[in-house]
Amino acid sequence: MFPKLGMGELVVILLIVVILFGASKLPQLGAGLGQGIRSFKKSFSGEDEEKPSTPGATSSDEASKAKQA
């Protein structure tokens, strides 16, 4: 579907990106791209970042149980 990119083509693409965004923005672009890929992979694997340790238990429930004990 896509033509194979050789080293020359990749260098030209990199030069265009540097000209458009500037060298100072490249680390920010790379970090944003990495975070996007990571979140995309997590969404496919079904992982959630915020999983409670016990289903249905909240911090207020745990606090009230600790006061009763």
Swiss-Prot record:
Family matches, as Pfam families: TatA_B_E
Q: Which GO terms describe its molecular function?
A: protein transmembrane transporter activity
> Its domain of life?
Bacteria
Q: How does it sit in the membrane?
A: Single-pass membrane protein
Q: Which residues cross the membrane?
A: 1-21
Its predominant location is: membrane
Q: What does the UniProt keyword field contain?
A: Cell inner membrane, Cell membrane, Membrane, Protein transport, Translocation, Transmembrane, Transmembrane helix, Transport
Q: Which NCBIfam families match?
A: tatAE (TIGR01411)
- Similarity comment text for this entry: Belongs to the TatA/E family.
| HAMAP family, per database record | TatA_E (MF_00236)
Protein name as it appears in the record: Sec-independent protein translocase protein TatA
Q: Which source organism does the UniProt entry give?
A: Anaeromyxobacter sp. (strain Fw109-5)
- What taxonomic lineage is listed for the species of origin? Bacteria, Pseudomonadati, Myxococcota, Myxococcia, Myxococcales
